[in-house]
């Protein structure tokens, strides 16, 4: 949620930010109209309350002086004021709800360093690492390799759950688990993250804090009986962990890592990446979240990206980093880097991590603040999030980039201590 003060004081700046995102700036005019009405209603209510308090004092004085007729007249006026105040309080409450509902639909303001563009075609490549492998044989896609070994089963997954699910057996199941443990070890032992085990079902308020609600409810799985949502990413419980709390500056930054399955309906992605494991309704991910101060959050974002890159470098998988343009930014993000791994089956780089600084957007929704060391002033924290990394896509990248002419796949050296084997199958 962006600061209403920013909209009041600099509406043109906010409108321009929305235009750069490809959003309709008319929402801001609607917000300003309701906000003005809301503030006028508050002022009028306070004036009537003040008048009613004055009447109460005068009634007591007049009764003491024996002027009962005048006192009765004031009592009647006080009753009328009470009814007006009640009506205004109801109006104030309704306007506040309308205002809050609209504010929840306004995306974050892009940082000045974000390239301006309409869609992903205008994202800007920042750097590359490694070179895509040149095969001296025709490489197979992961959706051909896995089933050929009898270790990846899309048909039975469809029988169990419908499309966009996968069953894996034996060495592939162990490779998935090895990747999870490897990533957690790197981030906790080398990068200083605290590992967190989080719930996979969260309250409506929690997932509103992190920005998935109210705008993207159709993309979420909901357990209706208990009104609990399956998490689309561990960012949700991690970023909301300190909601309603005041932290001390000396505690920051807090760096959290969590492994969870993630659940997404993918309602808006019909027809995209329908083959294999690239776009699933359920997938594993290791997530990184920082809680930090405004002064250092963009510097911390650069470090977060490097932490995610380390995983791909250790796995020796070629990748590139791109800075998302304004039109491709996520709803909550002020700045995002995507890390894209090379996949031979697509002959292209595909996203394997998305790292974002959402500034105080989530902190305002969740009332997450910290006390400044210098003056004791309370300020909103900044939160960052990033995949460190998507496990299923890492497995896919290994299968496709490490395949051999005989149809086998060599396991990356760093994973052998975790898998206990060097070759698949």
From Swiss-Prot:
List positions binding ATP: 264-266, 351-354
Q: What class of enzyme is it?
A: ligase
Q: Its catalytic activity?
A: tRNA(Ser) + L-serine + ATP = L-seryl-tRNA(Ser) + AMP + diphosphate + H(+); tRNA(Sec) + L-serine + ATP = L-seryl-tRNA(Sec) + AMP + diphosphate + H(+)
Say yes or no: keyword Aminoacyl-tRNA synthetase present: yes
| Gene Ontology CC annotations of this record | cytoplasm
Q: Which PROSITE patterns match?
A: AA_TRNA_LIGASE_II
Where do the annotations place L-serine binding?
233-235, 287, 387
Question: What EC number(s) would the UniProt record show?
Answer: 6.1.1.11
Under the subunit heading, UniProt states: Homodimer. The tRNA molecule binds across the dimer.
Which protein family is named in the record? Belongs to the class-II aminoacyl-tRNA synthetase family. Type-1 seryl-tRNA synthetase subfamily.
| Name of protein | Serine--tRNA ligase
Q: Which gene does this sequence derive from?
A: serS
């Amino acid at each position: 949620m962006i600061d209403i003060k920013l909209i009041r004081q600099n509406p043109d700046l906010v409108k321009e930010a929305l235009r750069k995102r490809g959003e309709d700036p008319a929402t801001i005019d609607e917000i300003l109209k309701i906000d003005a009405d809301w503030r006028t209603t508050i002022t009028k209510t306070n004036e009537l309350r003040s008048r009613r308090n004055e009447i109460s004092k005068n009634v007591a004085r007049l009764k003491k002086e024996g002027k009962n007729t005048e006192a009765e007249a004031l009592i009647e006026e006080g009753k009328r004021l009470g009814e007006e105040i009640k009506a205004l309080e109801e109006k104030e409450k309704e306007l506040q709800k309308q205002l809050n509902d609209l504010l929840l639909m306004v995306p974050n303001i892009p940082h000045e360093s974000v390239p301006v563009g309409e869609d992903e075609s205008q994202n800007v490549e920042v750097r590359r690492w490694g070179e895509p492998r040149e095969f001296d044989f025709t490489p197979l896609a992961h959706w051909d390799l896995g089933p050929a070994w009898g270790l990846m089963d899309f048909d039975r997954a469809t029988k169990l759950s419908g499309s966009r699910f996968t069953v894996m057996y034996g060495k592939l199941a162990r490779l998935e688990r090895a990747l999870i443990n490897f990533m957690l070890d790197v981030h906790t032992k080398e990068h200083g993250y605290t590992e967190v085990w989080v719930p996979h079902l969260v309250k409506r308020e929690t997932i509103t804090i992190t920005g998935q609600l109210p705008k993207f409810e159709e993309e979420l799985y909901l357990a209706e009986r208990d009104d609990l949502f399956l998490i689309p990413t561990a960012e949700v419980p991690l970023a909301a962990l300190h909601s309603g709390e005041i932290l001390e500056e000396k505690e920051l930054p807090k760096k959290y890592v969590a492994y969870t399955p993630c659940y997404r309906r993918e309602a808006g992605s019909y027809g995209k990446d329908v083959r294999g494991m690239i776009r699933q309704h359920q997938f594993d991910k290791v997530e990184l979240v920082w809680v930090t101060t405004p002064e250092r959050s963009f510097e911390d974002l650069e470090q977060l990206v490097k932490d995610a890159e380390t995983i791909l470098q250790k796995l020796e998988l070629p990748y590139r980093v791109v800075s998302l343009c304004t039109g491709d930014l996520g709803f909550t993000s002020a700045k995002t880097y995507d890390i894209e791994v090379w996949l031979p089956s697509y002959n292209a780089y595909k996203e394997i991590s998305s790292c974002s600084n959402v500034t105080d957007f989530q902190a305002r929704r969740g009332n997450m603040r910290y006390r400044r060391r210098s003056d004791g002033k309370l300020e909103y924290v900044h939160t960052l999030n990033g995949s460190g990394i998507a496990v299923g896509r890492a497995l896919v990248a290994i299968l496709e980039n490490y395949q051999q002419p005989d149809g086998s796949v060599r396991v990356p050296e760093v994973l052998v201590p975790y898998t206990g084997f060097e070759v698949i199958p």
